[in-house]
Amino acid sequence: MDLQELIEMINDARERLLKNGIFSDDKIIIDGFSASSKFANRFTLLHPEVVKLAIGGGISGCLTLPIREINGEKLFYPVGIGDLPEITDEKIKEFLDVKQFYYMGMNDTNDPFAIDEVRKGPIYSDIISESEATQLYKFLGADMLGSRWTKTQEFYRKLGCNVEFGSYEGEGHRPHAASSKVISLLEQNLPYKKDKVI
């Protein structure tokens, strides 16, 4: 999908709503689960100027790190942003300011970045390349619910990201566990209260 076309679609929808007397926020709320959670995170990183709130669940224990390198080693997308010059320092600052919530079920076994213990590479090489997997395992870890999930949170918090994380015990790969939290965030960030535009 061309992200610029998506932004144009959003703007077109906003204009059509306005013509019908329906006011909308200047920024969007983007929410995704599993593969679409990665889209929500990456879209927010690439276009933070249009996002008010980003929500993602079942994120495979990791997010794209909004940094270019670690200890002098360039981070390649989607592990980091070392090869994405379009993500400027200003965009990184905007991204860190966007309200975000990411969550995992602690019984989730759906790991698209799982490692093949025999050859020490990714099982699903059509999802992540060998070089990307090498960096992912090196800096975040191969264990989805262990080091990878923990280190991702540590990186985002250390960078000062406006983020919350949720870990739900006894839950697998499904969004239900976080529904109350997600609904609360939506209510807090929708552009109206009690049927009145604000």
Language-model-detected regions and their locations in the chain:
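Extracellular/periplasmic catalytic domains that process cell-envelope and extracellular macromolecules
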Residues: 22-23, 35, 47, 92-97
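Conserved hydrolase catalytic core segment
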Residues: 42-53
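C-terminal catalytic histidine-bearing segment of alpha/beta-hydrolase fold enzymes
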Residues: 133-134, 143-198
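Gly/Ala-rich beta-loop-alpha elbow adjacent to hydrolase catalytic centers
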Residues: 31-36, 40
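The feature captures the conserved acid-bearing segment of alpha/beta-hydrolase catalytic domains
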Residues: 53, 60-159
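Alpha/beta-hydrolase active-site loop
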Residues: 1-21
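Hydrophobic anchor at the start of a short beta-strand
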Residues: 28, 100, 163-164
